[in-house]
Amino acid sequence: YADAKADPRRVVVDNAAYTVAPEYRIDSGGLVRLDGVRVLSRGRTNPEWVAGLAPWKEGDRYDPDQVAELERRLLDTGVYDGIGVSLSPVDQKTAEGLRPVIVSLQDRPRRVLEAGATWSTADGAGVDVIQTRYNRFGRADTLRLEARLADIDSRIGADLSLPHWRRPGRTLKLG
C-alpha cells in the first residue's frame, strides 16, 4: 500500500483508573499495481534497457523493495551522477489503474581524460593517458582506452564493460 498515511490519533487518559488508551488510525489507501518504467533523462540511455532492469512485471503489486532494487541496479553501473526512482503520483494512473515507476537519470560527463607521469628506479620514466567514455551505446556501458609509454614497458589497450548484459546482475567485460 504505497499511499498509506497516518490519520490523527486519539489518546484517552483515565486518571482515576491510571490508564492511557491510545488509538492510532492509519488509512492504507488503495492497493497499488505497477505499470512499466517511465525514464526522464536528457542523456543517451535507452528507456527499453532501463525497463528491462525492473524486477516486476506489469500488473504486479507494489513492493518498495523491488523499486529499491531497480535503483540499486542503476547505481551499480557507475555511469550516472544522479539517479531517482519513485512511484508516480496517484493522478498519473493508467486507464487500467496501474501506476508507472518514474526513473530520472543524470548522466556523468560522456568523456573523461586522465593523464599522468611516473618515474621509478625499476621502470624508468613513463607517461599514461586514459580516455573513458560513458554510455556510448545507451545501456550504461563504459569504454576505456589506455596508452602507456615508458622506458621499459609500453602498451596500448581498450576495455569495454556492458553491465546487466542480457539479464540483470551479469556484466560482460571485453579487453
Where are the predicted features?
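Acidic, glycine-rich low-complexity/disordered segments
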Residues: Y1-D91, P109-V112, P168
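Gram-negative/organellar outer-membrane beta-barrel architecture
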Residues: D63-G175
